[in-house]
Amino acid sequence: MSYHELQHFTLLMTQIGFPRPISIDTFRKPDFFLVAEILHYITTVVAPSNAIAMDIATQEDRVYFITTVVNVLQTTLHLKLDSKKIYAAGPEAVRELRKIVQEVATYIGAAATSTDKGTSSAASVDLTLHSNALCVASSKIVEASTKLLTQLRLHVDDLYQRMQQAMSSQPDAASLSAAVQQRIKNLAAECNTLQEEVTTNKREKAKLEEQITQKKQSITHTMDRLDAIRSTKPPFLAELEALEADLSKLHLEYARKFRSLLFLEGQLRANDVREQQRVIEREKNLRALQENALKEELNNMYGGVDARSSTSHLDDEFVETPMPHVMDMHQPKPVQDFVPSKAAPINTNAEIPDDESYSYSYEEEEEEEQVISSANPMQQARAPETHSNGEKHRGLDELSHKSNENADNEEYSYEYSDIGGEELDPDNIEF
């Protein structure tokens, strides 16, 4: 903003009748209150119907005031204004205000010229009515001015005469000495006061230095205590280390038992699968024994005639229908798929047995196979037909009862082994 623009702005403000005097150096620093006052005055002049309250206490109020005033002036004067520059209230805001003031000055000048033509006669009438009062006031002003001038002349003349008398007269030694003594006393009093101030300052300085030393000593003492606290080992730290050691031991024990539990669960599932397979095989063998016994019984009842192997009934003229085959009369039921049962919970506190106790024996299986093979009528020679059916059923029941007793009394033992045949340690199993 140039000096010429500032001067022109101040002149325009006086021209539109702004009540507050504005200097050229007013806008060297931001003054938001002055800018708000100028905008409020301009809005009252241009748009008196749009009464805007000058509330600029907070930042939100200032922003609202600037935006509303700028919108009113833009719609009224048809100007393009920058609200950010006006809100800054600096030298850049003077250019925006200068645009507004120029339009307002032209507006006021046009309104004044239009009103002067219609009110010239009324103004002359008003002056004639107050002519006597104006004459009295002018006479009073003239009298007061003459009195003031005469008093000033008398005062100046008296002062000049006094100065001439003082310069021409001889000074009195007593009065001079008295004045000098008085001046000396005044200076001595001033020196005493200064000396007292110096002593008080020294005393205060000593007190401050003493306080500073005390603070330094307290700081050093606290630092020593802090170093001692840092150097000493607190008692709870040893307890914490002991608890950490116990926790590590418990964690190792938990990990070992967890690995053992997983291994035993796997062994239990494998044992359940083997047991189910044994039960299925045993049921198959019993079913085969029953079928063979039934077949033998039927063959004995019908005289050993087999519809598929023998064709003598075709040549027999007395046989009307062929005899049904034994296997067609009794078909075996289909075996259902095996579904392993859910593993039972394991006691984790139980000790894991040694490797020596895990040994699998095949003697009982061999005995069972021998019993089944000995009881199978297909592999042995046919019994004589004189045996009764009651004896055959009794032998079949004894075989089934014996096989069930063997299954109940079986004790299974397994060895820990990997796929390659190597023994496994339950504590060193990796999952």
UniProtKB/Swiss-Prot annotation:
Q: Where is the composition biased (Basic and acidic residues)?
A: 384-405
Question: Where does the source fall among the domains of life?
Answer: Eukaryota
InterPro entries named in the record: Clusterin-associated_protein-1
Provide the coiled-coil residue spans.
177-218
Instruction: Give the UniProt subcellular location, in the record's own words.
Output: Cell projection, Cilium, Flagellum; Cytoplasm, Cytoskeleton, Flagellum axoneme; Cytoplasm, Cytoskeleton, Flagellum basal body
> Does the record's keyword annotation contain Magnesium?
no
| Major subcellular site | other
GO biological process terms, alphabetically, are: cilium assembly; intraciliary anterograde transport; intraciliary transport involved in cilium assembly
Q: Where is the stretch described as Disordered?
A: 346-431
Q: Single GO cellular component annotation? A: ciliary pocket collar
Q: Which UniProt keywords apply?
A: Cell projection, Cilium, Cilium biogenesis/degradation, Coiled coil, Cytoplasm, Cytoskeleton, Flagellum
Alphabetized Pfam families for the sequence: Cluap1
Q: Where is the composition biased (Acidic residues)?
A: 352-370, 420-431
What family, per the record? Belongs to the CLUAP1 family.
Summarize the protein's role: Component of the intraflagellar transport complex B (IFT-B) involved in flagellar assembly.
Q: What is the name of the protein in this document?
A: Intraflagellar transport protein 38
Its ancestry begins with:
Eukaryota, Metamonada, Diplomonadida, Hexamitidae, Giardiinae
